[in-house]
Amino acid sequence: MVEQGDAAPLLRWAEGPAVSVPQDPALQAGGWVRGGSGEGRVAAEAPRRREPDEPAPPEVLLQPGRLELGDVEEDQVVAVFVVTFDPRSGNMVEWCLPQDIDLEGVEFKSMASGSHKVQSDFIYFRKGPFFGLACFANMPVESELERGARMKSVGILSPSYTLLYRYMHFLENQVRHQLEMPGHYSHLAAFYEDKKGVLHAGPGRGGSLPPVYWLPSIHRYMYPEMKITHPAGCMSQFIKFFGEQILILWKFALLRKRILIFSPPPVGVVCYRVYCCCCLANVSLPGIGGTIPESKPFFYVNVADIESLEVEVSYVACTTEKIFEEKRELYDVYVDNQNVKTHHDHLQPLLKINSADREKYRRLNEQRQMLLYSQEVEGDYSPCEEDLFVLFFLEQNNRIFQTLLEVSASQDKTLTAEHARGMGLDPQGDRSFLMDLLEAYGIDVMLVIDNPCCP
């Protein structure tokens, strides 16, 4: 079997089978409606009818900060644009549709700092109420005016980051086209006319665009739709890159800490690490997460985002700008390639890998090897490795919160070392993590695990 390295191009996106979405009256009206602790845009469409011999999918729900409902959401491309690097003026928006849309800052988001060092890249980012995907390319030219290199990005904006992947190949082709034939926008204009979305204004919104809301991790839709939200190989590479440290990231993600990942370009694969990090914190138990902010994938950020990051209490993002490391007020956890660190004293214990972490990592790898073996020998690629990764952490998180909820509902509300071991945690090594978890989620239990440092 040939394994793909972390720096290798990710495999093409793979879609799973269509999923039937249970309807309730709040969802059938379409437009922007409230759901759980947030809001989201849903399309008014009847659920897909399941064939007689088709088993019902398990009712598990995962997506962190999801804004779309899988196969029932229509295309919603709200802008298409071309960004160029001008040797005299710097990054600038060369062309866009619609012409009156606010694209301030997109010229820097879609062409990451340091991009001149790579030949091509792709970048996910957030712009106000939208998410963007841009494909960048750098072509040598014999032009003194352009200083020997022509650099452009072609991108789109959408209310949902989970649908952007559909247009990756188109954007890659179009940025090459723009490099070779600058100023020819007919294909992009036709694409926008075909895919443009109309955002419905709800009561009291007038004609203004709705703000972004983050749906809770717990809702009714089905796991198989998750398969369209990431490229094949994404989470496998995530595990290989971080190794046992994914358990450290898991704890910080579950605590909804502000996580900033630094890496030099190319930034595309780092955007996938942002997404994978958010997936570590999925929970499908009712009653969990109502008092804690959602894990927000901001994807690529730069110095222009500092003001917006200052007011965020929870996010996962990546950057190519080393200056962020000095701005400690903006993050709780800083990841420099594979080095995970925090400047908060009370979070320092979470940086240590303990015996329970090693056991979880061993089990994860054991399950991965069994899956890969069955795929090779039996040719069975369902479930895939990505399913295994997401469900592994979902099960772990559910086990923790199920235990905590049961203890909080008991008469004495006492959480013991035996409970900790039953949750797959180290009673001493994870004591600080458990205390932070109880506080963050507002769970009323009494922790009676002795602190080995305080006899």
From Swiss-Prot:
Q: Which residues carry this modification: Omega-N-methylarginine?
A: R41
Disulfide bridge partners, by residue number? none
Q: Which residues lie within the region annotated Disordered?
A: 1-59
Q: Return the PANTHER family for the record.
A: DENN DOMAIN-CONTAINING PROTEIN 11, LATE SECRETORY PATHWAY PROTEIN AVL9-RELATED
Asked whether the UniProt record includes Acetylation among its keywords, one would answer yes
Q: Name one Pfam family in it.
A: DENND11
Positions of post-translational N-acetylvaline modification: V2
Which residues belong to any copy of the cDENN domain? 214-362
Membrane-traversing stretches = none
What residue stretches are annotated with the dDENN domain?
364-455
What is the name of this protein? DENN domain-containing protein 11
